[in-house]
Amino acid sequence: YRLTYYTPDYQVAETDILAAFRMTPQPGVPAEECGAAVAAESSTGTWTTVWTDGLTQLDKYKGRCYDLEPVPGENNQYIAYVAYPIDLFEEGSVTNLLTSIVGNVFGFKALRALRLEDLRIPPAYVKTFWGPPHGIQVERDKLNKYGRPLLGCTIKPKLGLSAKNYGRAVYECLRGGLDFTKDDENVNSQSFMRWRDRFLFCAEAIYKAQSETGEIKGHYLNATAGTCEEMYKRANYAAQIGVPIVMHDYLTGGFTANTSLAMFCRDNGLLLHIHRAMHAVIDRQRNHGIHFRVLAKTLRMSGGDHLHSGTVVGKLEGEREVTLGFVDLMRDPYVEKDRSRGIYFTQDWVGLGGTIPVASGGIHVWHMPALTEIFGDDACLQFGGGTLGHPWGNAPGAAANRVASEACVQARNEGRDLSREGGDVIREACKWSPEL
């Protein structure tokens, strides 16, 4: 492999798709051989020379390992940079992109472990994707909500409630001051609560809360299903009853289904909330798998208006700088290379819409100052137990979150330092909000 696929003199083309792999070779296997093997196995190579190689232009189509750097502080671990010609990939297909780059190479014998740390998607390839159904600005315009983070809540217990009781919990949270409530990722259509009943009772809750508060409300109706046809049926029903947003579990549902649903949502005026169930199976190991920043990039291409992104402060794992790095990759039009935040390549999204990061998991009102400072306005903060665990009930829990959020936004706008004064801001707000 090394003679053909390790090319340290290669000049990267503007249209190349670039990958950074964290590579741990087996003892005794040279890093150059491993890097070349990764490039070969994820592009045109196979385990032996085949006569049909002579019938194609291998130099035009092969992946190339063009750089290797040792990982500081790690024994026998390297970052291998691989460049792939754009012609290897089908236009507008995240499925094909991932099948090519990570489909086969991770079981390779010469490697002890392999992790895809980052991808550079060139503008020429980005332009073949539709991206999020609507994007951040259109969502704000649809909801008529500006200048603050959006607030949500996952209805708990996530399994076991009847549709009517579920709808009642939705209504109380929305009436109390939240913008959204949410189906949990494993709420689909079980015997205790079929999807159509849930959709109807949640729609009733949304309309009742809207008429009482004068604000636009939503509930993420989970359209994830066992087949794409059933998923379309559920999303179509949501559009017919006039709700603003549906939801999809994009890793368990698959990228093909997700891209199809994103196109449906764009055509039918629905926002699309994306849950990342199963991500930790893929991204939690430090030296093997796929980093979440890659899953976030591919989701932005496939299509989603919201994506769960970790909290930095709650019960689920997430390092601050690294989390902020992939939050920027989800939202911003252009992101500079910054290794301190785990960003290996400069990424230009050339007009592809942004995805709102969703902070969810073990957060409550005392986290509000930190969340406001870390995520800024273009984020959705979701308090499940932090709303429903309020001693007075769901609506007071929702009111407490809304008051805390608005107090933090006001303090920030007045120039106060939330990292130092956050606790004081919340305590001051308590004086005029008994719920808080």
Curated annotation (Swiss-Prot):
Pfam families (UniProt xref): RuBisCO_large, RuBisCO_large_N
Residue(s) at site: Transition state stabilizer: K315
Molecular-function annotations in GO: magnesium ion binding; monooxygenase activity; ribulose-bisphosphate carboxylase activity
Superkingdom in the source lineage: Eukaryota
Gene Ontology CC annotation, any one: chloroplast
EC nos: 4.1.1.39
Quaternary structure, from the entry: Heterohexadecamer of 8 large chains and 8 small chains; disulfide-linked. The disulfide link is formed within the large subunit homodimers.
Name of the protein in its database record: Ribulose bisphosphate carboxylase large chain
Organism this protein belongs to: Euglena anabaena
